[in-house]
Design a protein with these regions (language model features):
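ATP-dependent adenylate-handling active sites, centered on carboxylate activation for C-N bond formation
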Residues: 1-219, 236-249, 265-277, 281-338
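N-terminal, charged/glycine-rich beta-strand/loop interface patches
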Residues: 255
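A short alpha-helix-loop-beta-strand transition element characteristic
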Residues: 222-232
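Surface/interface-facing alpha-helical segments and adjacent flexible terminal/loop regions used
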Residues: 258-265
């Protein structure tokens, strides 16, 4: 709360919140709303028709009484933005590019249709708390702690790069309270066995970021709607699209006919660092090279989920995601009192 408060009261420019409907952006928006005159906080969400995040963002905006704008764009509008996104973020990492498109387009909208200049977001929480879905497969406490700190150490190559550049390229200023130095140090000082949600033996349905959720439940139970507070993780790059056709599938469908098999192989061979293995990666790399030739080592590696054998970085490819999605469809709920 303090990391949000000081960024609100010290801001001399009009502010707004990116509100995806996930736990992190919803939590930040709800806390910001406490320090803004009632009904004056601007929140923005973006997605394609049927995007899984949109209904939750609307639910939160009504709960916190924000002035909410929902931006719905077509699959083609998302896809067409990729070249300018890669130019502005200066990255070809698969996950970063996918997630940056929504960020870039919503920031562009804000810059053109709003007087807000300071933009709050929920980035950094997944790295700090072990909130990515693949952490469910983390083998032990020591590895959990190591992986969180590894992600934080490398965050400037991925999520923070995405958030900062997609927002700042439109003349806006990003605010990321989850990465407040004091908050990060305090959170990491907690015993690993508390931070690792896989240790929650009493839960019938383990959920990522359990400690963060439970602390809200106990200290400010009215802060968020219960089904948002206990909503399982949905990556922003997936949540902008529907479950019927994910954003990564939309991209790949449009690119599959772009290269012949021989053309694809020959073009991939010229790269030694982070060699492309898919047409999507090759497409991003060629766009990157057209602006930043011989600068490929600026990205040390491709971001990928650990503790699994998936070959695509989308969380929707993970078995744990499929299991949780199946459970939600059968109306199984999480025991919030565990």
């Amino acid at each position: 709360i303090e990391s949000v408060k000081k960024r609100v009261i010290n801001s001399e420019r009009n502010l707004a919140c990116l509100l995806s409907g996930g736990l992190d952006s919803s939590l930040i928006s709800a806390i910001v709303a406490k320090w803004v005159p009632k009904g004056q906080l601007q929140t923005f969400s973006i997605g394609m028709m049927g995007g899984s995040d949109l209904k939750y963002a609307k639910m939160v905006s009504e709960h916190i009484n924000s002035n909410h704008t929902e931006i719905i764009l077509s699959e083609q509008e998302f896809f067409d933005a990729i070249p300018e996104v890669i130019y502005n973020i200066e990255s070809y990492d698969t996950t970063t590019v996918r997630a940056s498109v929504g960020n870039y387009l919503v920031a562009k909208y804000i810059s053109e249709h709003s007087d807000a200049k300071v933009i709050f977001n929920g980035d950094g929480s997944d790295e700090l708390t072990g909130g990515y879905m693949y952490f469910h497969n983390c083998p032990n406490n020591m590895e959990f702690d190591y992986e969180c700190k590894r992600l934080l150490n490398d965050i400037q190559y991925f999520d923070v790069l995405r958030s900062d550049r997609t927002i700042s390229c439109h003349g806006l200023e990003a605010r990321t309270p989850f990465l407040d130095r004091t908050f990060v140090n305090n959170y990491l000082s907690l015993p690993i066995e508390f931070r690792n949600h896989n240790n929650n033996k009493n839960s019938n349905n383990k959920i990522e970021k359990w400690l963060l959720r439970q602390s809200i439940q106990e200290n400010d139970p009215e802060l968020l709607p219960n089904n948002v507070l206990w909503r399982s993780k949905e990556a922003f790059s997936d949540g902008v699209s529907s479950h019927n056709k994910s954003w990564y599938e939309i991209i790949q469908d449009r690119l599959n006919s772009q290269y012949s098999e021989n053309d694809f192989k020959s073009k991939c061979e010229k790269y030694n660092h982070n060699k492309p293995t898919t047409v999507e990666q090759l497409y991003y790399r060629e766009l990157f090279d057209s602006h930043f030739h011989n600068k490929d080592k600026i990205i040390p590696y491709f971001w990928m989920p650990k503790y699994s054998n998936v070959t695509d970085s989308s969380a929707r490819k993970l078995d744990i995601y499929k299991e949780k999605n199946k459970m939600s469809k059968t109306n199984l709920t999480i025991d919030v009192n565990c």
